[in-house]
A protein has these predicted regions:
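Solvent-exposed interaction patches of small proteins and small membrane subunits
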Residues: 1-147
Length: 147
């Protein structure tokens, strides 16, 4: 785990990118069973992999940033990642769908606020943030919510 907050921007952007993709994958679904069955379960499986990535990236965030923004559920994010990674087949599709629809937007908003705060406090490099905005790897982030 990194100890310098300046390194955390990339991890938070990776999480926001994963959230943006998941929101794209669930956008057309109101029922968990429809989401689970869609595209031969591709949307569901891709979302699980992105949730694993969210957990991986959150684990890389420095203790300094986690301490500064302790209201975010860092431990639960990592815990859900571990649950998916170690019991992939046993993951409840209804609970997962509920998390994707109801918890992920809250997490997204919290992370956008953290990025905004850390940029304005000069703890993140603005140049690095601007580069990310033009990168093809970060096209699913709602930058308007941060700028």
């Amino acid at each position: 785990m990194q100890s310098d907050i300046k390194n955390d921007l990339v991890y938070l952007l990776r999480i926001l990118e994963s959230i943006g993709k998941i929101q794209l994958y669930i956008a057309d679904f109101e029922e968990a069973i429809d989401f689970f069955r869609a595209n031969d379960q591709q949307n569901f499986n891709a979302s699980l992999m992105l949730l694993i990535n969210i957990g991986e990236q959150s684990n890389r965030v420095s203790n300094a940033l986690k301490g500064k923004h302790s209201s975010l559920a860092w431990t639960q994010i990592k815990g859900f990642r571990n649950r998916i990674a170690h019991d992939y087949i046993g993951i409840d599709r209804f609970i997962t769908f509920d998390i994707l629809q109801n918890e992920l937007p809250i997490l997204k908003n919290q992370l956008e606020q953290i990025v905004q705060i850390e940029l304005s406090d000069d703890n993140f490099e603005k140049e690095e943030y601007e580069l990310a905005k033009s990168s093809e790897y970060y096209t699913h982030i709602d930058y308007k919510n941060i700028d």
